[in-house]
Amino acid sequence: MDKQNSQMNASHPETNLPVGYPPQYPPTAFQGPPGYSGYPGPQVSYPPPPAGHSGPGPAGFPVPNQPVYNQPVYNQPVGAAGVPWMPAPQPPLNCPPGLEYLSQIDQILIHQQIELLEVLTGFETNNKYEIKNSFGQRVYFAAEDTDCCTRNCCGPSRPFTLRIIDNMGQEVITLERPLRCSSCCCPCCLQEIEIQAPPGVPIGYVIQTWHPCLPKFTIQNEKREDVLKISGPCVVCSCCGDVDFEIKSLDEQCVVGKISKHWTGILREAFTDADNFGIQFPLDLDVKMKAVMIGACFLIDFMFFESTGSQEQKSGVW
């Protein structure tokens, strides 16, 4: 054995390589023939195989037809502000088109965009909102569709159509609010909003319930059957804190979620009506009812937080 090793070393004394082995690899790289089982992977000085290498490379290097990891799984479209869209999940059974996103989330964040023209001139423009999940991914984009005269003459009590689109630009939810009385002292013509998904197909309603002290609402399904209740605080003031509207069972004994108006800072609260909201609901809640909760949030926004400055609805007592 010693004699054989000495013969092998004599062939390439400067590299200590076996007889017949090409000496193109550096001395420190020799760990045995490439691909030979029982030898460790490549060392620091071992050069990687060239691009398109088809043979069995050293251990630790990817082989052909093997997936490359740490790459994005979804080709997500990116919005104007660089916000990624939420990947579309597998639609559950009997799910209206476009509502499959709601099947996998239990929290929604709604951010109203600041309109510079409205801030500088007080001229009321169409409201626009970003609807995101808890990871900051955009789920929907919502835009109000009303004429100039209606917005500036009727103010927060105005009727409106609010269209909610998905990442493909398809309108998946439509909110219809008729013109109603905004005073709690007049119980004959209270606020309501209709939620449609897809557009033209009602899936639920949010109906204001008269109460002398508290803002209350009833959530109804497409058959006008009561499903849930919403109860807000007596003082709908957002000064330095959030305002919570609790989502309750029909007997109002169990709280199942909430709609929160988030405090956005003294300057934004004082000079704009661009508000931030959060909606929390059970993960297993029907996607139609989750969409109805979005409609309830927009109705609450227009009723209590659309006015600016020290106007009554912004910091009043219900």
UniProtKB/Swiss-Prot annotation:
It is an enzyme of class 3 (hydrolase). A motif (SH3-binding 3) lies at residues 84-92. It comes from the Eukaryota. A motif (SH3-binding 1) lies at residues 18-26. Residues 99-290 are annotated as: Interaction with hepatitis C virus E2 glycoprotein. Residues 1-84 are annotated as: Proline-rich domain (PRD). Residues 1-288 are cytoplasmic. Residues 31-44 have a biased composition (Low complexity). The chain crosses the membrane at residues 289-305. Changing D284A: Reduces the Ca(2+)-dependent phospholipid scrambling. Its cofactor is Ca(2+); Mg(2+); Zn(2+). The modification Phosphothreonine is found at T161. A motif (Nuclear localization signal) lies at residues 257-266. GO terms for molecular function: calcium ion binding; CD4 receptor binding; DNA binding; DNA-binding transcription activator activity, RNA polymerase II-specific; enzyme binding; epidermal growth factor receptor binding; lead ion binding; magnesium ion binding. It catalyses: a 1,2-diacyl-sn-glycero-3-phosphocholine(in) = a 1,2-diacyl-sn-glycero-3-phosphocholine(out); a 1,2-diacyl-sn-glycero-3-phosphoethanolamine(in) = a 1,2-diacyl-sn-glycero-3-phosphoethanolamine(out); a 1,2-diacyl-sn-glycero-3-phospho-L-serine(in) = a 1,2-diacyl-sn-glycero-3-phospho-L-serine(out). Phosphorylation at Thr-161 by PKC/PKCD increases its phospholipid scramblase activity during both cell stimulation and apoptosis. Phosphorylated by OXSR1 in the presence of RELT. Expressed in platelets, erythrocyte membranes, lymphocytes, spleen, thymus, prostate, testis, uterus, intestine, colon, heart, placenta, lung, liver, kidney and pancreas. Not detected in brain and skeletal muscle. It is a single-pass type II membrane protein; Lipid-anchor. Changing H262A: 60% reduction in nuclease activity. Catalyzes calcium-induced ATP-independent rapid bidirectional and non-specific movement of phospholipids (lipid scrambling or lipid flip-flop) between the inner and outer leaflet of the plasma membrane resulting in collapse of the phospholipid asymmetry which leads to phosphatidylserine externalization on the cell surface. Mediates calcium-dependent phosphatidylserine externalization and apoptosis in neurons via its association with TRPC5. The N-terminal proline-rich domain (PRD) is required for phospholipid scramblase activity. This is Phospholipid scramblase 1. It comes from Homo sapiens (Human).
